[in-house]
């Protein structure tokens, strides 16, 4: 197939001279509105653009916070790709998308770059609705090659000639989905360019002039033509001689290009490794790759996280994601916490339980610090397992441990646990194995937006037989629920808790297992009943105070369990109150739906005994903002709860508030 080639750059005297502002810190970058402007520059000016792009990225993230190290690591690569390829006609897909801030600056979004991850501002990831230069959205890892192959096949079917480029990191490459896609791509032989951004040196040997020279050689047309001719001759040779010739070619390339054998076996033409910060190496290789005419290609690029900013280079983990910081010192503006973070409470509680029970083990899928498993790892390194970006494997690995009498705690964000759903059903629930799921980031998560929201676990776990489902109302409840999970040894269980800090309440010294399927009364009233599942309990208390000011006596109950449901508590609330409202930090199909199903089956709603309402997340994917703003928009704050009560009473909350005043 004939590939699309970007127009050749003008040379010599035909090169465009771009007028720049000598007083700006980024004079050349200031002239670039889209990659079309970048492609008008002389090659020697591209280095300056990259330097200025790095400075702009540093300055922008210092104002907004966000993912930092990954973006700095791909500044030269981003610049080179947009210079060589004809984006957006050539499709450029960033795996995960957290490294795409420089890409956004070059593709017409620089004027909004300081709105990153704020309400109404730019997404922290690639997003189709944001720009034509984001042909495929992302935030979860290891999807780029599959999406890219789909685009490449669509191009072939429609007779197109554009390139498709997928940029994927070595961490994301560890996930099974990436290899499934590569295996399929190699078999289909469609034109697809995969750029492996190796920023952890986990695959690559040292790079330098020899590697760059060989990469240019092997990606060049002369070598490829000779190689193809040799293949045709080889077909006419006796099989034994042909096999030996193949081995000679494989060994010679494998010896010089160590690391490419696996990709060649998957059907990719391997080029690299090359220095991802050296434009003299990157540009000619990418140009050669652009002009290749058939088959999938993998370009192995070695980069450094945090490149060009000293503090980030010295501490890649600390600067992977940052809050606002001082550019001169690197000091991050972290406010002193008012209460412990939920993931830390989980980690500390699990350590205390493990000190008493040697069968307890912890599993994480590449998120040890985010889940609190790093705390457990410090105390019990031999009982901690980070399986990488492999949620499917993590779940079944935990099931295997449980089948042998161990007590695995599988700590995974709600949004990422979705990736292991079949394993939860097939390997855990059907076999009734006591895997303990610690579901972090339940509910809305703020700046990371819809892709990271933990909206659906109540619904997707609630339909499974044998599953115990709990939600912590506060950090003290979390301690007791960890102890409860330890005690549940006859079936699987899940415990959900949100991102961020707790309420700052008094903490128990040790966790005490709760009675399974029993909630608790928080405040006794007579007219209105608020039944909370999770950390909306604090908003229910605020709402009850406001309702009391309107003369409405309000009961508050904490359900604690969604499965098994505290049916006695639900019936009591329904019989003793005029209005019953459930409140949860999850989608339709969760806790409220289970309560509604029970009340309906009991006939409790037939005679109008109680006015029943549910409060759930809206049936939309909410854009990023602060968690408080997102919950307010969803109507799941105290104000929204009060409004729901007045709606059920057939009254207007605004009118009632005026009367009260």
From Swiss-Prot:
Q: For binding thiamine diphosphate, which residues are annotated in this chain's numbering?
A: 98, 139-141, 171-172, 199, 309, 391
Q: Fetch the InterPro entries from UniProt.
A: Dxylulose-5-P_synthase, THDP-binding, Transketo_C/PFOR_II, Transketolase-like_Pyr-bd, Transketolase_BS, Transketolase_C, Transketolase_CS
Query: A Gene Ontology biological process annotation?
Result: terpenoid biosynthetic process
Spell out the reaction equation it catalyses. Answer: D-glyceraldehyde 3-phosphate + pyruvate + H(+) = 1-deoxy-D-xylulose 5-phosphate + CO2
Gene Ontology molecular-function annotations: 1-deoxy-D-xylulose-5-phosphate synthase activity; magnesium ion binding; thiamine pyrophosphate binding; transketolase or transaldolase activity
Q: Which SUPFAM superfamilies match?
A: Thiamin diphosphate-binding fold (THDP-binding), TK C-terminal domain-like
**Enzyme nomenclature, EC number:** 2.2.1.7
Instruction: Relay the cofactor remark from the entry.
Output: Binds 1 Mg(2+) ion per subunit. Binds 1 thiamine pyrophosphate per subunit.
Classification via NCBIfam families = dxs (TIGR00204), PRK05444.2-2 (NF003933)
Q: How does it assemble?
A: Homodimer.
Q: PANTHER family annotated for this entry?
A: 1-D-DEOXYXYLULOSE 5-PHOSPHATE SYNTHASE-RELATED, 1-DEOXY-D-XYLULOSE-5-PHOSPHATE SYNTHASE, CHLOROPLASTIC
- State its role: Catalyzes the acyloin condensation reaction between C atoms 2 and 3 of pyruvate and glyceraldehyde 3-phosphate to yield 1-deoxy-D-xylulose-5-phosphate (DXP).
Supply the name of the protein.
Answer: 1-deoxy-D-xylulose-5-phosphate synthase
């Amino acid at each position: 197939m004939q590939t699309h080639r970007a127009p050749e750059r003008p040379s010599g005297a035909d090169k465009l001279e771009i007028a720049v502002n000598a007083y700006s810190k980024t004079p050349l970058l200031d002239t670039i509105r889209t990659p079309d402007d970048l492609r008008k520059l002389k090659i020697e000016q591209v280095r300056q653009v990259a330097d200025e792009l790095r400075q702009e990225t540093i300055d922008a993230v210092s104002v907004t916070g966000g993912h930092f190290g990954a973006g700095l690591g791909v500044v030269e690569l981003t610049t080179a790709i947009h210079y060589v390829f004809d984006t957006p006609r050539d499709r450029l897909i960033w795996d995960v998308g957290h490294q795409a801030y420089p890409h956004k600056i070059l593709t017409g979004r620089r004027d909004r770059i300081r709105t990153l991850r704020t309400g109404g501002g730019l997404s922290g990831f690639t997003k189709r609705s944001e720009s034509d230069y984001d042909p495929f959205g992302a935030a979860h890892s290891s999807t780029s090659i599959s999406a890219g192959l789909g685009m490449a096949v669509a191009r072939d079917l429609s007779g197109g000639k554009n390139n498709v480029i997928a940029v994927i990191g070595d961490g994301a490459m560890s996930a099974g989905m990436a290899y499934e896609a590569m295996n399929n791509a190699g078999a289909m032989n469609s034109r697809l360019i995969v750029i492996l951004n190796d920023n952890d040196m986990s695959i690559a040997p040292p790079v330098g002039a020899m590697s760059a020279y060989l990469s240019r050689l092997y990606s060049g047309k002369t070598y490829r033509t000779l190689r193809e001719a040799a293949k045709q001759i080889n077909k006419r040779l006796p099989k034994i001689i042909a096999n030996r010739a193949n081995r000679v070619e494989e060994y010679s390339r494998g010896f010089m290009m160590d690391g490419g054998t696996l990709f060649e076996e998957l059907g990719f033409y391997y080029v690299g490794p090359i220095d991802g910060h050296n434009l003299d190496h990157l540009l000619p290789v990418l140009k050669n790759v652009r002009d290749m005419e058939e088959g999938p290609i993998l370009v192995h690029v070695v980069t450094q996280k945090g490149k060009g900013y000293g503090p980030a280079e010295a501490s890649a983990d600390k600067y992977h994601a940052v809050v606002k910081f001082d550019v001169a010192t690197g000091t991050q503006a972290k406010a002193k916490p008012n209460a412990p973070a939920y993931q830390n409470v989980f980690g500390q509680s699990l350590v205390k339980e493990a000190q008493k029970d040697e069968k307890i083990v912890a599993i994480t899928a590449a998120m040890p610090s985010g889940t609190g498993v790093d705390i457990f790892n410090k105390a019990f390194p031999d009982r901690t397992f980070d399986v990488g970006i492999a949620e499917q494997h993590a779940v079944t690995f935990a099931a295997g441990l449980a089948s042998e009498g161990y007590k695995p705690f599988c700590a995974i964000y709600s949004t990422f646990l979705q990736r292991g759903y079949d394993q939860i059903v097939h390997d855990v629930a059907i076999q009734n194995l006591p895997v303990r799921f610690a579901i972090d980031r339940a509910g809305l998560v703020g700046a990371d937006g819809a892709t990271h929201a933990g909206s659906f676990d109540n619904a997707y776990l609630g339909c499974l037989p044998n599953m115990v489902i709990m939600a912590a109302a506060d950090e003290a409840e979390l301690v007791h629920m960890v102890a409860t999970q330890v005690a549940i040894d006859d079936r699987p269980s899940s415990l959900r808790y949100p991102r961020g800090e707790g309420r700052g309440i008094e903490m128990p010294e040790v966790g005490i297992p709760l009675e399974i399927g029993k909630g608790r009364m928080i405040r006794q009233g007579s007219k209105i009943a608020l039944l909370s599942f999770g950390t909306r309990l604090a908003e229910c208390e605020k709402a009850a105070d406001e309702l009391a000011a309107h003369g409405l006596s309000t009961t508050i109950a904490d359900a604690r369990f969604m499965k098994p449901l505290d049916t006695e508590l639900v019936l009591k609330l329904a019989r003793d109150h005029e209005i019953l409202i459930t409140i949860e930090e999850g989608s339709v199909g969760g806790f409220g739906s289970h309560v509604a199903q029970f009340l309906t089956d009991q006939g409790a709603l037939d005679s109008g005994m109680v006015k029943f309402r549910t409060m759930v997340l809206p049936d939309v994917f909410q854009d990023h903002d602060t968690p408080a703003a997102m919950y307010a928009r969803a109507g799941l704050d105290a104000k929204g709860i009060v409004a729901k009560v007045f709606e059920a009473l057939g009254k207007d909350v605004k009118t009632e508030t005026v009367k009260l005043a």
